[in-house]
Each structure stands twice: as C-alpha cells, then as structure tokens.
Design a protein with these regions (language model features):
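An acidic-aromatic
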Residues: 53-105, 172-175
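Residues that act as N-cap/strand-start positions at coil-to-secondary-structure junctions
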Residues: 2, 50-52, 60, 70, ...
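Short loop/turn positions at the edges of beta-strands in beta-sheet-rich folds
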Residues: 29, 58-60, 70, 142, ...
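Short, surface-exposed coil-to-beta transition loops
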Residues: 51-53, 72, 79-80, 143-148, ...
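Bacterial N-terminal signal peptides
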Residues: 4-17
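Gly/Pro-enriched, hydrophobic low-complexity segments
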Residues: 94, 116-202
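Flexible, processing/modification-adjacent segments and terminal tails
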Residues: 21-43, 47-49, 77, 86-146, ...
Length: 202
C-alpha cells in the first residue's frame, strides 16, 4: 500500500509507546461489522497501483471474510488457524495453515493479536485531527513487513485505512468505508471448496 504519511519527525517528540490500547479498541470495534474496501498494490519502481475492491466481514479477529468483486471475483476466508483463497475463474482453492510466521506477515491478523504485536513490532501512536495514526515497526530486520500505518477514527475507533510496505519495497493499502453492524456466525469464516475445484494445501 502506498502512503505519504510522514510521522517520523513527530514521533521523536510526540509519539509514545502504545501497549495495544488503541488497536485493542479498534479490533473490538471491527467485530460484527461489514464494510466496503478498496485495495491498492503498487509494485516497487511503479507509480500506478493495481486496484481491487469488494466487501469484508469481520468476526472477532482474526476471523475475516474478504469478497473481491472487481476486477476479478475471488475470496479470502480466515478462521484464525487456516485461510482459504478461492478464485472461481481458476477453479482452485489454496488452503494455508497460519503459523506464527505467516501471521506476522498479515497486518489485519496482527491488529487482533496483542501478544504477537508485542513480540514482533514496536507500536506507537499519534493523534492527527479526527484520527489516530498507529505505526507498527518490526523488531526483526528480516521481517517481511517493514512498516505498517493504521488510521483509526478517534470517535468510533473504526479502522479507516491500513498501509504497509514489504521488504521488497512493494506498497499495499486497504481503505475501509461504510462500516455497519451485521449478524455474523462462525460458518462465515470457514470455507468448503465447491465440488470439482482443485485444492492446494500449504
């Protein structure tokens, strides 16, 4: 995700270590909500982003269901222990076991895991107008994720945007909008592959 947020100057004097307080509130606020999202991926060295959009349903993190509608239909489902990635056009489902390393590479999973945040990242916050900017800097130089910036509405504690850069220099952003409460069940966060599709396990 691309971000031009410049927080480093302020962080030297104003940023304070955050013991997960704001992110814990944000994680709690997400539970049982549905929102529209726009994802932008900008490869290193490129100025034009690849844009995708759809809807996302959050259970208690790390349970999530990301339904992409444009430009291609695909589905990501997370139950906390596994993820399912289904592309109807390819007739293939990829099932991945989420170990600690994989979890640390997925910012939305870190938001809901206080212990993993403390272990893997230095967390700081800055109040910026009507929003709180939370930054996660990896403790390990070899970390896949280099920098995460989370924009949280100060009044509702809802996440508005997540930006991050990976160690290859690629930028990714998720913008959330139109969040509203909805009924959720555990069945939403489990995926049964349709008959006739190829299943790849990782």
């Amino acid at each position: 995700m691309q971000t031009k947020l410049s927080i480093f100057a302020l962080s030297l004097s104003l940023a304070i270590p955050l013991h997960a307080a704001e992110l814990d509130r944000a994680a709690a606020a997400l539970a049982g909500t549905e929102a529209q999202f726009t994802q932008r991926f900008t490869p290193k060295g490129f100025k034009t982003a690849q844009v995708e959009s759809g809807t996302v349903i959050f259970g208690t993190l790390p349970m999530m269901r990301w339904s992409y509608g444009r430009p291609e239909e695909k589905l990501f489902v997370f139950d906390g222990q596994h993820s399912w990635f289904y592309v109807p056009g390819d007739k293939q489902v990829t099932v991945t076991a989420l170990d600690a390393t994989r979890r640390s590479e997925l910012p939305f999973l870190m938001i809901g895991d206080a212990a993993a945040r403390e272990k893997n990242f230095v967390v700081r916050e800055n109040a910026r107008g009507p929003a709180t900017m939370v930054t996660l800097q990896p403790r390990a130089a070899s970390a896949m994720i280099r920098n995460v910036v989370i924009t949280i509405a100060s009044d509702s504690h809802l996440i508005q945007r997540v930006d991050y850069t990976d160690r290859e220099g690629n930028q990714t952003s998720f913008e959330l909008r139109g969040a509203h409460q909805r009924a959720v069940s555990n069945d939403l966060f489990h995926f049964t592959p349709p008959a006739g599709v190829q299943v790849v396990e990782q």
